[in-house]
């Protein structure tokens, strides 16, 4: 019996072997190279061993902490509004309304998710330009002086919120779809029993809906944290990290340090720190998934 089980395990690992080898080549080797490069001062001619000097310089640079804080703000702002908007729209679409109307709105609301981040960013650049749709709308309704314009992407106060707003608009349909699927899986009997007991709408939402969706909410929030924290396209397309680094996030500052300033070792140290943060979030996510399966 044990011999047969051992044979089955060997056979399974033999099938997994090529895939694991390919995974190692595509992921482990590049990661090892980045860690190695972070320990060197690298220019186009030579590599000089500096140990942890890149990390020491990085942690003593005020710009790094500013960028890290902006990355956290961008990530948390996006995830919170993804959840709030997605939950609200999922609840609306789950109400008992005309099926055709519900399907129509479901199709319309999912449209932002169909755009690639680069395309969505370019659309919002046009909308937020000094002579774009948003300023025109504000002028029309009397909230903006006709002789004045707001440079949404050119002001340190509004650049990062503008990029965050675009990211919220583009990705909220993912939350809406996932939460709507979760709502449809909740048995109606539970709500009917609550109605018989005279339970209010708020209590049904808080004590039935939220606990039933807890697993889905935790999973999609963790995933969205990981995806948003490493988002490069929205910031690069809309502001390039400016003005004066006010919308810079970790992925863009790594890109600029590596390919514009040619500080490959320093940029590698930044990448390692970002990897450690994302790795921690990934461990939490994997443990959550394993707990659900087991």
How would you name each of these model-derived features?
Residues 1-3:
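N-terminal hydrophobic targeting signals that begin at the initiator methionine
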Residues 5-294:
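A structural signal for multi-pass alpha-helical bundles of membrane permease subunits
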């Amino acid at each position: 019996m044990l011999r047969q089980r051992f044979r089955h395990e060997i056979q399974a690992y033999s099938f997994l072997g090529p895939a694991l080898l390919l995974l190692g080549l595509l992921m482990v080797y590049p990661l090892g190279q980045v860690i190695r490069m972070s320990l060197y001062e690298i220019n186009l001619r030579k590599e000089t061993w500096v140990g942890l000097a890149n990390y020491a310089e990085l942690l003593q640079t005020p710009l790094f902490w500013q960028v890290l804080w902006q990355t956290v703000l961008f990530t948390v702002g996006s995830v919170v509004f993804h959840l709030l908007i997605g939950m609200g729209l999922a609840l609306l679409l789950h109400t008992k309304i005309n099926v055709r109307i519900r399907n129509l709105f479901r199709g319309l609301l999912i449209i932002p998710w169909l755009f690639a981040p680069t395309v969505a960013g370019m659309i919002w650049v046009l909308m937020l330009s000094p002579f774009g749709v948003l300023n025109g709308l504000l002028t029309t309704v009397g909230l903006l002086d006709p002789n004045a314009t707001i440079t949404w992407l050119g002001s340190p106060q509004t650049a990062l919120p503008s990029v965050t707003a675009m990211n919220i608009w583009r990705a909220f349909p993912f939350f809406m779809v996932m939460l709507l699927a979760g709502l449809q899986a909740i048995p109606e009997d539970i709500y009917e029993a609550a109605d018989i007991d005279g339970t209010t709408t708020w209590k049904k939402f808080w004590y039935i809906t939220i606990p039933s969706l807890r697993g889905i909410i935790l999973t999609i929030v963790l995933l969205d944290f990981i995806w948003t924290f490493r988002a490069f396209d929205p910031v690069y397309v809309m502001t390039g990290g400016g003005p004066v680094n006010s919308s810079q996030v970790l992925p863009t500052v790594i890109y600029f340090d590596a390919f514009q300033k040619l500080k490959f070792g320093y940029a590698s140290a930044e990448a390692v720190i970002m990897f450690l943060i994302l790795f921690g979030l990934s461990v939490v996510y994997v443990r959550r998934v394993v707990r659900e399966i087991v």
